[in-house]
């Protein structure tokens, strides 16, 4: 499997979720299965089947997270030399040339992306258009909503 780029914070969040699933959620589900078994016939026991389904989802997510962490390439941008170029993990300030609207995005791994928080995936059209560019560069990016032009006003490594 190929390496999965993620920020230090993204790796921490996955580890926290993994710990919660293993130490809190898994025991809760096991208890729910045991309690449902006590209610008798398993063929028509909806509680039992629901708990088993939850167990499947939980175990699947545990495996998924362990796989991602096992293949993670954790990148600490704060330790990198700021040469002004947009790279993975950088926080980029942009001005939309058409609307004069200012936006700030941080380029993160796929699992960390959340556009409402200004976190965009390194594989998104905007991030792909920004990587390698510098402050004062103008970029034209083809997005699902059409062509958008931005001026890069800041690049920070936090």
UniProtKB/Swiss-Prot annotation:
Keywords: DNA-binding, Transcription, Transcription regulation. InterPro entries: GreA/GreB_C_sf, TF_GreA/GreB_CS, Tscrpt_elong_fac_GreA, Tscrpt_elong_fac_GreA/B, Tscrpt_elong_fac_GreA/B_C, Tscrpt_elong_fac_GreA/B_fam, Tscrpt_elong_fac_GreA/B_N, Tscrpt_elong_fac_GreA/B_N_sf. PROSITE patterns: GREAB_1 (PS00829), GREAB_2 (PS00830). GO terms for biological process: DNA-templated transcription elongation; regulation of DNA-templated transcription elongation. GO terms for molecular function: DNA binding; RNA polymerase binding. HAMAP family: GreA_GreB. Necessary for efficient RNA polymerase transcription elongation past template-encoded arresting sites. The arresting sites in DNA have the property of trapping a certain fraction of elongating RNA polymerases that pass through, resulting in locked ternary complexes. Cleavage of the nascent transcript by cleavage factors such as GreA or GreB allows the resumption of elongation from the new 3'terminus. GreA releases sequences of 2 to 3 nucleotides. Belongs to the GreA/GreB family. This is Transcription elongation factor GreA. It comes from Haemophilus ducreyi (strain 35000HP / ATCC 700724). The lineage of its organism: Bacteria, Pseudomonadati, Pseudomonadota, Gammaproteobacteria, Pasteurellales. The gene is greA.
